[in-house]
Amino acid sequence: MKTAIREARPEDIPQIQTVRNSVKENMLSDPALVTDADCKEFLFERGKGWVCEIESQIVGFSIVDLKENNIWALFMHPDFENLGIGRKLHDIMLDWYFEQTQKDVWLGTDPGTRAETFYRKSGWLEAGTHGNEIKFEMTFNNWKNRR
């Protein structure tokens, strides 16, 4: 199975939405809450995104928001979890982010999920809450020391 990770393009948005709405954890209460226009704004105006393709199908993606210093999204299609793809998308995204700025980056995720475990293992530090989610932060120095 050949995987290819590349920068996201506008034509990827429908498949990005499919992946986002296929997840079993951190599900949107209403899929209409995240529009194609939102995806476009975060991908091309506020930050940058990456996708992983297998046989022309997007199976995962990551998006970082430079304006709010936030990981806006990191999602894998459930059929392609536990293959190391999420880790690669995460690392490419953070490498790029910290090439742009040395400001701390943060994210929120639901407690008791595999995502929580993933971020803890990846060196993210718990920094309180964001709504009902756990807020995690990564500093420039923590990231560079992990590389």
Description of each model-found segment:
Residues 74-82, 109-110:
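A short, internal acetyl-CoA/4′-phosphopantetheine-binding micro-motif in the GNAT/acyltransferase core
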Residues 88-104:
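Conserved acyl-CoA
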Residues 52, 82-90:
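Glycine-rich acyl-CoA binding loop
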Residues 40-51, 70:
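A short helix-loop-beta-strand connector motif used in the catalytic cores of GNAT acetyltransferases and
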Residues 2-18, 127:
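A short beta-loop-alpha structural element at the N-terminal edge
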Residues 13, 17-44:
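Conserved GNAT-fold acetyl-CoA-binding loop/helix
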Residues 51, 57-65, 70-75:
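Conserved beta-strand in the GNAT
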Residues 50, 102-116, 120-147:
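C-terminal "cap" of GNAT-fold acetyltransferases
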